[in-house]
Amino acid sequence: MAESGGSSGSSQSPERPSSLADRNGALKCTFSAAGHSTGLLQGLAALRAQGQLLDVVLTVNSEAFHAHKVVLAACSDYFRAMFTGGMREANQAVIQLQGVSARGLRHIIDFAYSAEVTLDLDCVQDVLGAAVFLQMLPVVELCEDFLKAAMSVETCLHIGQMATTFSLTSLRESVDAFTFRHFLQIAAEEDFLRLPLERLVFFLQSNRLQSCAEIDLFRAAVRWLQHDPARRARASLVLRHVRFPLMQPAELVDSVQTLDVMLDDALCRQYLLEAFSYHVLPCRQHDMQSPRTAVRSDVASLVAFGGTPYTDSDRAVSSKVFQLPEPGARHFRELTEMELGCSHAGVAVLDNFVYVAGGQHLQHRSGEGAVDACYRYDPQRNRWLRLRALRESRVQFQLTALGGLLYATGGRNRAGSLASVERYCPRRDSWDFACPLKRRTWGHAGAAAAGRLYISGGYGVSAEDKKALQCYDPAADRWEPRAPMREPRVLHAMLGAAGRIYALGGRMDHVDRCFDVLAVEYYVPDADQWTSVTPMRAGQSEAGCCLLERKIYIVGGYNWRLNNVTGIVQVYNTETDEWERDLHFPESFAGIACAAVLLPRSGHGR
């Protein structure tokens, strides 16, 4: 009973311990063997070397290559399509290949089993041709890398032919860049004489040629033409891309007009006549603009003219001209000098000629030092040409290019502030008066946009004039008011960029003190509306200003917080609305005049 009673009570079987998998079901790791890929390749290479499991023979010109289909298909899109795409070769043990060389195929198969390829200038064309044909992109890229590293004056044009043959864009661009840098050296090579016409024209017409005087380019082109008598008929097609007007007159007389190739071709004679006319009539050079008169440069430089240190002990102003070679540069260097020192002049650019007018040749705090001089700077020849003087002396005025003419607006001189506007015609080398401003104005800023001339701020007759915006219509010869700026400012900067007109910096007066204006705003002519953007970090009035690749550079000027001239160069990105890292001008000057100019990349004539 006791036993039966005991057996009828509840009993529990021993608890089964949970498995390791149950307790750690969430634990999962993936491991990789670092040397597996290398070992796999080595194993496949060993099978090939020992003749094991080989299932295909590729033949080229009676030379046979044994391989594994799976290896070829894994490496090459061409073989993958052949062996898996239902082609008849998929079931063939021996396949004859067309379109590749035996040497090229050998390198390709060796690469498939080793991931390595040995290249030299003798075999690379065969290897590259095979890699392109068999669609083995890694080998194509290795060949491109090798050819870029092997590029030299001697090999450049041959590599360029390969780039063209196999449609390798990146390699072609590298060849072009190298050729532009070393064109004259390459032109002395024998390969240059075999250059196709279209490639020669491509280089001669480009602005990217560096360190090349036009007379040397002409000699290279003539050498190419004289290599084959049949090319003489194409002389004008080639020489039309030589910029004869940029040569020195003596070069035209002594080295160009004496050659039969120039005298026998009617168009070549026209090119020569064009060049002589360009030199004889400098004031009409604007009417003769063509691709042959353009400076060989594809990047504009910031060029800064003159300025004053505002020292009490010395009234001298600077005659130095500095350049910032390109937008990415960090340092200015001296470019040339003006005939006389000048500050607070007007500067404008027409057809890449820089006009510098008015200003002062001695430091004055008022308009007493205003001058009427006007000069034109030719960056190609690094020469100054004195032009007809302004009708009125002007300082702290605006000089603006619009419609092929120059407009000098307002300013001041010994007699006081001015409302007059002068218009300069380069062809006639003369100034005449246009419609005057509504009121006397100096210390204003100006810019051209959409066929109109705009001036803003400055000292007028009332406090409101410091915010005023006036618009000049050259067709109607009339000034009209537009929406005023949000901030009053004088001695500020103004320029057009991407359909907007920016007003930057300057100062404002309060009782007997002056304050920096840090606010920046832009005007949209179609909307007649101003919009504020990120302010400047430091004050700059009486500063130079120009636009390079959508960035505004404000150069030097006067800082009223420091009560001194400054050498800072602030850079504003119009696309991102951000101020970038500051630059530093070589001098601390106010009254600098700035312009964006294409400077020749060669030292010829400089």
Swiss-Prot record:
Matches recorded under CDD domains: BTB_POZ_KLHL26 (cd18255)
SMART domains xref list: BACK, BTB, Kelch
Highest rank taxon of the organism: Eukaryota
Modified residues (Phosphoserine): 430
Pfam hit, one: Kelch_1
Compositionally biased intervals (Low complexity): 1-19
Keywords for this protein: Acetylation, Kelch repeat, Phosphoprotein, Repeat
Leader peptide range in chain numbering: none
Disordered: annotated span: 1-20
InterPro entries: BACK (IPR011705), BTB-kelch_protein (IPR017096), BTB/POZ_dom (IPR000210), BTB_POZ_KLHL26 (IPR030588), Kelch-typ_b-propeller (IPR015915), Kelch_1 (IPR006652), SKP1/BTB/POZ_sf (IPR011333)
Modified residues (N-acetylalanine): 2
Residue ranges constituting the BACK domain according to the UniProt record: 156-257
Kelch repeats: 301-352, 353-404, 406-451, 452-499, 501-550, 552-599
Location of the BTB domain: 54-121
Role played: May play a role in endo(sarco)plasmic reticulum (ER/SR) mitochondrial signaling. May be part of the ubiquitin-proteasome system (UPS) and affect ubiquitination and degradation of target substrates in cardiomyocytes.
Protein name, as recorded: Kelch-like protein 26
Lineage: Eukaryota, Metazoa, Chordata, Craniata, Vertebrata
UniProt gene name: Klhl26
